[in-house]
Amino acid sequence: MSESLVLLAPAANHVYAGQAGRLCAAELSLTCPNATSVAPVTVAGVEYLSIHSEDPLPPADLAAVARSSAALACFEYRGDLLAPLELPQVDVVDEDLVTIPKYRGKTNEQFTRLLLNLTLASLEGRCATRRDEGQRLAILDPLAGRGTTLECAWRAGHNGFGVEQDAKAVEALAAHVTTWLRRKHLKHSCGTHPVRRDGRSLGKRFDAKVRFPQAEPLTMGVFTGDAADSAVLWGRKTFDAVVTDAPYGVVHGSHSGASRRRSPTDLLREAIPVWAGQLRHGGALGMSWNTLGLSREHLVTILSAAGLTPLDDDLWHQFSHRVDSSIHRDLIVAVKP
């Protein structure tokens, strides 16, 4: 039996930091193929995650540790000594693409990375094959906000696509990505343009592409529009994964025609079948939500009715955590057969 210790990265959010070890342990228990157990431990007053495995961690597991939401370094535990293990370079772009933006309501970037990792680890069929071959996957966030999920997708080497009803949020995303690309001196193209179909305006679309030597470009695209209109906006395009952070209780209605006011539950009931239709077979939908407004059982029913298969065994019941007094967040992943 081999034991490895993962040193946790610091978290800026003190509430999340207190739960990061437990959440990352649950993440690695699902993403490390050869781990027999993962649990928080304290060694000489420092918190680590202990990973037990039959043999020393192979490259696939070290890659899972490297891309995990809260890992800083990894060691092989030999008696009372720690032998450093070199983690592979898994990030395609620098992490400051994700960490620079600071604004009220931003989803914690460590949690976003966790949700993305779990969703991609759950892919099946051809989607899983593309992932394992290192191909760029297509990730959709139909509640994109200012683009944390899309930026995390870029960091992981995947293409990010989104829909966001708040035009100012899309403008802020476009400004940040454009400035970041220029400051990094990366070969790129980006811009925002109006979108019209059948003689009517569908809003605006921001597109960005960054080119790398001897590698496939990374692309990003975001429409202004309603989350439930995602299939209309993206047309026939399909995605390997949908990864999104559902609204926690604020109004998230349409701006087209008369203003609609929808609860988060109403939005998800209306939009999840649309998002499920945009998934490729074997693709996965990963979502976080506020359990104080919608029970897990109700959400499982909505996902199942949309033709998805929720992953709901005990391993998936370890991610519930407090955000603040009015938000208790959990996540769920469902696969399209």
Where does each model-flagged region fall?
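Class I S-adenosyl-L-methionine-dependent methyltransferase catalytic core
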Residues: 1-27, 77-140, 144-337
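N-terminal auxiliary segments of SAM/dcSAM-dependent transferases
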Residues: 2-82
